[in-house]
């Protein structure tokens, strides 16, 4: 059969996997894989299920666990599954096992940790982020197995822990302790971001800075405010003052989506429990996604300038801590082989032109790029990650599986 005929056969087989994909999503959703940083049990149960499924397909599976005494068993799983090709050069698809917490349960229409199917839509925590990548890549390999095709490159599936809280127990651990797994001429695909049309190939990310602000004042009875220093009021004014960051670091780069830096207040920690007490301690967080043209040290210097002004104005003490600080690595070249392979595959499946772009969100691809490994992030993304009622369209899941199958069987 010709390569085109082989791919047509793969597409037909994958189109018949609808129920199988639903069944796997169901098994993944109910195995809660929230990490210990978010008071969860970790990824062990999900990894054990997937390791068994991969071995059932005949793949060689090895676990490279990262020590972590915060989870049962004391380890975070990192699975590597290989399907031998005609050469040792590899095509990698890296997905992550962990999910974020459910958030406000009242905003969910159904149980977040039980799959709900409504027509072509699948609902549940993790169905998109990142079960989409897990399911699409596994069923692409399954289709190859059913057709008996041997790919030119060896296919590697990496299922890693800890993506949602920094990757130190996941990909960062693998790259530090097992750098031999990945090579510069490998094609590395990370299905963890994109747009609904599947036309965005992410090759660059903004720098990421998460800041924790601790505001200290003096607690007192709310009827005697002159006896205290209200940290809630000081925090509110500080949050508003931090809007100066967007004015200071105001460059626009259309290559990125969105094209400007963002500085968003997000989490607030609980202070006092009762209404009639003025809080003497306030803690809030700022999520900064900064265009690579800026150095994060300059952003932090501006933050210190703003907080110093707020300290003087409100008679409080403000300490700032960088919870996460990642200066953007060099971008993957727009003409890299992995980008070209994805463009050809997207065109073949969706009849659309996928373009390389930069994004504001952080993905594990940054760790690859920092090691000089050109990775591309791509998926047909429903844009519901981290939201209540997270969902994925089954047709997009099937289509993306076909895209990965095209890369597997057509790339040399």
Ranges and model annotations:
Residues 1-9, 16, 193-198, 203, ...:
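Metal-dependent amide/peptide-bond hydrolase catalytic core
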Residues 2-123, 146-151:
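Acidic/His- and Gly-rich active-site-bordering loop/insert found
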Residues 76, 110, 184, 206-208, ...:
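Short, solvent-exposed loop/turn segments at the edges of secondary structure
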Residues 89-92, 121, 156, 186-188, ...:
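Structural motif
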Residues 94-96, 158-160, 189-192, 216, ...:
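Short beta-strand segments
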Residues 120-135, 221:
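Glycine/serine-rich anion-binding loops at beta->alpha junctions
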Residues 130-204, 412:
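Acidic/histidine-rich catalytic neighborhood of metal-dependent amide-processing enzymes
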């Amino acid at each position: 059969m010709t390569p085109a005929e082989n791919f047509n056969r793969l597409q037909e087989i994958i189109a018949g996997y609808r129920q199988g994909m639903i069944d796997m999503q169901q098994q993944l959703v109910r195995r809660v894989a929230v990490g210990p940083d978010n008071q969860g049990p970790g990824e062990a149960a999900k990894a054990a299920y997937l390791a068994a499924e991969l071995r059932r397909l005949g793949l060689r599976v090895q676990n490279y666990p990262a020590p972590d005494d915060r989870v049962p068993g004391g380890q975070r799983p990192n699975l590597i599954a290989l399907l031998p090709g005609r050469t040792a050069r590899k095509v990698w698809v890296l997905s992550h096992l962990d999910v974020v917490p459910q958030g406000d349960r009242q905003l969910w229409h159904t149980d977040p940790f039980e799959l709900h199917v409504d027509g072509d839509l699948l609902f549940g925590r993790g169905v998109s982020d990142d079960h989409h990548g897990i399911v699409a890549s596994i069923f692409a390999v399954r289709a190859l197995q059913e057709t008996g095709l041997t790919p030119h490159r060896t296919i590697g599936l990496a299922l890693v822990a800890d993506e949602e809280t920094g990757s130190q127990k996941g990909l960062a651990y693998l790259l530090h302790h097992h750098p031999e797994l990945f090579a510069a001429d490998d094609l590395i695909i990370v299905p963890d971001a994109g747009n609904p049309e599947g036309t965005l190939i992410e090759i660059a990310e903004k720098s990421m800075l998460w800041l924790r602000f601790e505001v200290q004042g003096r607690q007192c009875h709310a009827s005697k405010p002159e006896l205290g220093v209200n940290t809630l009021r000081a925090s509110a004014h500080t949050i508003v003052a931090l809007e100066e960051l967007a004015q200071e670091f105001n460059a626009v780069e259309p290559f990125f989506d969105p094209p400007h830096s963002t500085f968003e207040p997000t989490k607030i920690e609980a202070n006092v429990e009762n209404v009639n007490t003025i809080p003497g301690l306030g803690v809030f967080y700022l999520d900064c996604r900064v265009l690579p043209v800026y150095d994060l040290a300059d952003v932090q210097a501006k933050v210190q300038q703003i907080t110093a002004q707020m300290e003087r104005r409100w008679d409080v003490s403000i300490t700032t801590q960088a919870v996460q600080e990642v200066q953007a690595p060099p971008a993957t070249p727009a003409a890299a082989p992995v980008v070209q392979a994805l463009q050809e595959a997207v065109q073949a499946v969706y009849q659309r032109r996928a373009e390389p772009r930069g994004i504001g969100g952080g993905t594990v691809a940054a760790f690859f790029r920092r090691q000089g490994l050109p990775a591309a992030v791509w998926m047909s993304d429903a844009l519901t990650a981290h939201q209540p009622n997270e969902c994925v369209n089954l047709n997009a899941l099937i289509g993306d599986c076909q895209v990965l199958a095209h890369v597997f069987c057509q790339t040399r």
